[in-house]
Design a protein with these regions (language model features):
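Structured segments of extracytoplasmic/periplasmic soluble domains
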Residues: 2-6, 44, 61, 76, ...
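A generic beta-sheet turn/junction motif
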Residues: 7, 16, 293-295
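Signal peptide-directed extracytoplasmic domains
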Residues: 9-75, 79-114
Length: 349
């Protein structure tokens, strides 16, 4: 009776953040083999052998015989109970998101901090409690997942930093298709502080299997038909918007022929497996890239925080080298009075 009264399973109390969950012994068929141990102890010196019984009796006077009380429970029921508790605790992590309509309306969703019960650690704590018959409350281990983009960062995008547009003919349907595809692939991108934008990474391979079509492209100083013709107009439009917004250009090359849609020094050539247009966000706030294509016009807009808005002009110095037209491209930062306070070299063309 003493054993049964003092070695009985109790409720297992699991605490987390002011919430308490209880697992009762009946829910997991938890019990201890006390009856078997009592029977074993009672019969220890009652074997069929008289001499063995005498030996065991005298051995007990010298050494204590330890009999193990074992726990018995239904592992499947325990797992199901812990899974049920985890579902009441777990919260999926969600990044805050920025939404900007084609007309320029800005909104943002809130971030959600993720929570996930450490099931393995919870089971180990319960196993220890049962084994040691120590039913003090267990503090659950819950892993916290912080969102990469928090609410404050998303809501800091509150104004248009810069925009640039170029025109194109709608007569070549293949070229229009390529423009629309690449503009969409590089649009609605939130670029966090220090993060780099890669045009090629976002569009992926510009192949027919990805929807791109044959259209005129500049290859070795000549216009030829090739898959993806027109995507460079999108990258060039974006390049100019990037310059006006003060972002850091990290990779840009010009075409071998002067482009029809931007002046010399203002284009950005891209090619699969080759030239890429890349830039970084130098600000402490995120920026958001938004491209639109409508009625023969590509517009690239870059949004960010009002404190990062700059008064920038683009300066191009044309020159001739080897009988070919070339140019040096600069951006000029101006103060509120329009005076140039800083000139930054971008690249040669």
């Amino acid at each position: 009776n003493y054993i049964n009264e003092n070695i009985t399973p109790s409720d297992i109390q699991l605490n987390y953040d002011e919430e308490t969950n209880i697992i009762s012994p009946d829910e997991i068929d938890l019990k201890y083999n006390t009856s078997e141990v009592v029977d074993e102890a009672y019969n220890y010196t009652k074997t069929d052998s008289y001499f063995e019984n005498i030996k065991r009796f005298f051995d007990l006077n010298k050494n204590i015989k330890n009999l193990e009380i074992k726990s018995l429970y239904n592992e499947n029921k325990l797992s199901e109970k812990i899974q049920s508790i985890s579902e009441s605790i777990n919260v999926a992590m969600e990044n805050a998101k920025v939404y900007i309509s084609d007309s320029g309306n800005i909104s943002a969703s809130s971030a959600t901090i993720g929570k996930e019960l450490d099931i393995a650690a919870t089971k180990e704590s319960i196993y220890d409690a049962i084994k040691n018959k120590d039913y003090k409350a267990i503090d659950l281990k819950v892993n916290i997942k912080q969102p990469k983009i928090n609410t404050e960062a998303a809501k800091s995008v509150n104004t248009l930093l810069a925009e640039f547009s170029t025109k194109f003919s709608t007569n070549d349907s293949n070229r229009v298709t390529n423009i629309v595809l690449s503009a969409k692939a590089t649009s609605d991108v939130l670029l966090m502080p220090g993060e780099e934008f890669s045009y090629n990474n976002l569009t992926g391979k510009r192949t027919k299997s990805n929807g791109y079509k044959d259209a005129p492209v500049i290859i070795n100083g000549k216009l030829e038909q090739d898959v993806g013709g027109g995507v460079c107009q999108v990258s060039s439009t974006l390049f100019n918007s990037v310059l006006y917004s003060g972002l850091d250009v990290t990779s840009r090359r010009n075409h071998s022929l002067k482009s029809s849609y931007v002046s010399i020094g203002r284009d950005a050539m891209v090619s699969d497996g080759g030239s890429d247009f890349r830039f970084k966000n130098p600000y402490s706030h995120p920026v958001y890239i938004k491209n639109t294509v409508s009625n023969g016009v590509i517009t690239s807009k870059i949004y960010g925080n009002a404190s990062d808005k700059k008064n920038i002009s683009i300066k191009v110095e044309p020159y001739t080298t080897g009988g070919l037209d070339a140019a040096k491209t600069y951006i000029e930062n101006r103060d509120s009075n329009g005076n140039v306070i800083r000139t930054q070299y971008i690249s040669n063309s």
